[in-house]
Structure formats: structure tokens, C-alpha cells
Amino acid sequence: MNKKLAAASLAVLALAGGSFSVQAADTPVYSLDAIVVTANRTPEKQLDSNASVSVVTAQEIEQKHFTDVAQAVKNVPGVFINTHGAGSQSYNSDQIYINGSSNVVVLVDGMRRNTNGNSLMNASIGELVNMDSIDHIEVLKGSASTLYGSDAQGGVINIITKKAKENGVRTTLRTSFGDNDKEKYTLYNEGKEGQVFWTVEAGKELQGDYKDGWGRKVINHLNAEHYNVKLGYDLGNDSNVVLNYEKYKSDYTMPDKGSFDTTPDAGKKDNDSLSLQYQAKLSERLTNQFSIYRNKTSFDIPNQFWAMKMKTTGISDQLTYTMNKQTLIGGFDWYKDELPYNKGDISEGTSVRNIAFYLQDKIDITNQWNITPGVRVDHHSQFGTHTSPSLSVGYKQNEKTNYYFNYKTFFVAPNLYQLYSYFGDKTLNPQEGNTIEFGINHEFTDTLNGTFNIFHTHAKNIIRSNPTTWMYENTGKANVNGFSLNLNKEISQHWSASIGYSFLHMNAEGDSNINSDGNLPESTLNINVGYQADRFNANLSGRGIMNRYGSVNNPEMRNYANYWVWDLAANYQFTKGATLFARLNNIFDQFYTDVGTSTSPNADYWYSAPGRNFEVGLQFQF
């Protein structure tokens, strides 16, 4: 039945074309003419990028009222996030998967935000809540080892923040309330005076206990606040220097062993990030970007092995040289991950360092054909030197169609938790492998565009936790196959829509289920319908999960392998600069969990998502 449903969905996508696909006149149907930077670390049209790139715009963030980055990217085809309960602000979760891999690099303005030492996530994107400061989010699906690190096996999430470009000052005030004792207050200010530009954001969020789709109460408490200050100076000639500081702090309470444990665990989080970035146009052909950053992550969960503080310090520099038919990119990345404090079983002061040099050369062989060889050389303080070559071939049939073929290799070192924790193994080997992908970016008409991407990943020395002993081990080889398809259509002046489908198949190991022992779904369908009229706009979003079977050891998860979750957001500008907005989440009160490793609804370690809940608020801009 589910296979027939998936096949029918694909048939609709392939044959019906635009008639099934929608988003509104001013709702963010993202054109393939839009400029993206993540695919090749230099600005280019999305159509020409030789990669599968999805974009979440600032307009989409504002109209749908996403709370954090995790919520914003969850509906991107090919992305799956293991969200525990109400979200990672009151847990230590939000493991990100792209194309079936949890080895994903997260960047803010091109600077790493990954954490090293956490068992449940590689970056705390659910705690990146400064949404007003975001210009757009680029999600690169597929290995991006050459430019972003050999651990970018699944892909890259690059959060691009705003820079005020026009003189003047603009301010946004927002407040909202909802059920489950939800309250939110935010202030955002941006401006430019002469050569100085800035953005300032501050916010506070409160949450209480919630009910799942079966009406059962789940312990949940959150008292969080965040601050963000960016100060920049325009040096002229497309050059600038930017200083940025972010702070996130919270007190929270979660249930001890899953949603229906009545024992509350109280914890704290305290994160901050400081960075300095210099961008310079040295000549008509040569540009330079230099970055230095320091990230701190601190979380304290009673009775958990991963209660610790983590610190990352990094420096990167990149030169881009553009010729008539050639773009040469080269640079280096250095970072150090360390545990300055840990109350668990990993020794305080434990650290690892990695330095890498990379070079990539995009050559236009003809007006239609291009080839991009690349190489990255990493030297890891514990695992030595590894070389990761890559090759991309592009064929631009015309101004509306681009085909590409990519071959990328990767090397993923074990993290500190996998090496040194109670469940770790110091003899683990790095995970290595390659990804082959083929894709098409195509504009059917001025109002309809689509992308298609198919990939195969082969990896060896897979690092996984043993389901019986929980000890980390190298478990052999993995072969991953999948594809994703996305269509965007502007139907009329008022109506628009989008639809995306992704398929994933990972071979089963031993007696386990497919797709990482059932942790990830075989099929995901994402639908968005938008309406825009003068002062009113609304968006209906649906996410369908199919065939996420769960572990062989937890057969009851099969009863919850398929589900749909629908959300609705609406905005009404009742006077100039003033908007009333509302959001209804999980409209049909679906009972589900985003955690594929859950057991059963009445047992420990089941993590129910919230049932139907709402938020209503006011926004003022001046």
C-alpha cells in the first residue's frame, strides 16, 4: 500500500507537473535564478550550481513563523531531523540527517558550528533561534568534502545572516502567546549610517508541559533567552569587516526516560559564539575571505553521560580568482575542538585539531560544458593525513536546463564522545567512502521550476552504537541509494505551491532493519500551498513520513511507521507596520515521534511530539 502511494506520488510529480505544485505571488517560490553561495563557496545562480541546493528565504521564515533553524529546514526534501519531544531547547537532540547521513557540516556565514563530543547531535541548530537575523538558509544535499571538510558526507547547512544595505534604521517588535504556557518576545533592529552597519536581536521564550496526539501530558519546561549583535564596517569596493556575537541561555526540564516518565530532570544550557570576518575585493579578479571564530556550548543534564562544556576555535582563509572561463578557489581551514570541563567520563582538557588545505578549479570547456576537479588534504591530530579528491562535470543545455555529475570522497573522524566516553572505543577507525550523484536543475516556464537528484554512497568503517551494549564500534560497509524531486509553481497572482519527494534505501546490517535499523524513513513527501492577497497571506504545509519501521528490537514501532503532520500559518496586516499572525501546528492532532529509535508508546525512551497546538501574536515594524 505504501509503495503504491509513493509510486502514485512520483507519477503525479512527473506527469502532472505544475498542476500539483504551489506557494504565492510574494510567498517564497525560490527561483533557480536566485544567487546561492554554498555549492561552490562563491556566488552563482542556483540553476548553474552543479549541485542539489534548497533555499529557505527570510520571507518564508517570517510568514511561517519558524521558531528555530531545525524547524525551518525540516521540510526540505532529503533532510530528516530526530527531534526529541517539543524540540532540542528542552532536550539535547536534533540529530540532522541529509541523504541518510548524520555527518553534516553546519555553518553560519561560512563558519563552522559543529560540536564534537555530543552523542545525539552534530550541531545544535534547534538552539539557533535568532530567526529575524537570517537572510536565508542554504541546504546543500550531497557530499561537499573539498570545500567544507571531509566530514561533510551528507551535505551542508549554511545559514546566511542579514547585512543592512541601505541607510536608515528599521525595527521589528514581536510578541506571541499559545497553549502549553507558550510565550515569546523578540526585538530586532538593523540599520546603516554611512559606512557602519549593524543588526541587533534579543528574545525570550517560555514553554510548559504539553500534550501529545493521544492527549497524554508530557513534562516540559523552558525559560530561554537569546541575544545577537553584528557590527560591520563597509570598506568600499565590495569589501567589509564584520564582528558578530551570539548568546543563548536556558533553564529547562525534561522527563527522565522518555515522554511518559514522571520523573523530571532539570538542566541548563549556555552557548555563545564570537567571530570576526573580513571580505575583500583585492582586484577585479581576486577576492579574499578571512574568518576567525570561537564557539562555546555548555549543557548540564543530571544523570547523563553527555553533560559537558565544549569549545571550538577556528581560522579559515579563502582566495577566489576568476578568469574568463575559469574560477580557481583555494584556502585553508584550521579548528580545534576541546572539552574544557566535563562532569562525565571524558577527561577534561581532551582535544583534537584538524588543519586542511583545499583547491578547486571550475573550468568552462565550452559554452555548455564545464569540469571542476578538486582536492582537500586534511591532517587530523589523531588520525593523520587524508586526501579527499572530487570531480564535478556540468552540462548547461540552455538558459533553463543544467545537468551535473559529481564524484566526491569523504573521511569522517570519530568524535570525542565516540572515542573517550564510557561507551567509546579509542581504537575506532575513521569512516571513509565516496558519493556519486547525478542531477538536473530545470525551469519549465517562468512560473514553474524543478530539481531532480539521484545518488549512491558507499562507506566503510561505519561508526555506530551497538544496540545491545551501546558501545561504539566500526560495523563494516554501507551502501546508500536515494533520490529527491522538487517542483515549485506560481499558479496565479494569489496562489502558489511546492511539492518535494525523497526516497532513501540503506542496506541492512546483520539482523537489523534497513535505513540505519529503521531510524530513517524510506519515503518523505513535503507539500506547501500558499495564498497571498494584499494584506493577508497564509501557508499550509504537510510532511508525510512513510516506512520508518524502527529497530528490529522494537517491533511495535512498525505501527507508527507512517504518518502525516500538517501545519498552518497566517498573517494579516491590519494597518501599516502592524500584523496579526497565527500558527496552528499538527492540525489533525497526529500521534507520532520523530525519533526512529523510540521503543513503544507505553515504554521508556519513547519521545512523543506535541499534539495540536497554536500560537497567536502581534508584530510591529517601524
Predicted segments with their positions:
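Short acidic/polar hinge/loop motifs at secondary-structure boundaries
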Residues: 95, 112-141
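Gram-negative outer-membrane beta-barrel transporters
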Residues: 364-371, 456-458, 474-553, 573-579, ...
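Outer-membrane beta-barrel signature, preferentially recognizing the C-terminal barrel domain
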Residues: 259-281, 308, 400-402, 407-460, ...
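Face-selective signature of the C-terminal outer-membrane beta-barrel domain
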Residues: 234-249, 266-398, 444, 448-454, ...
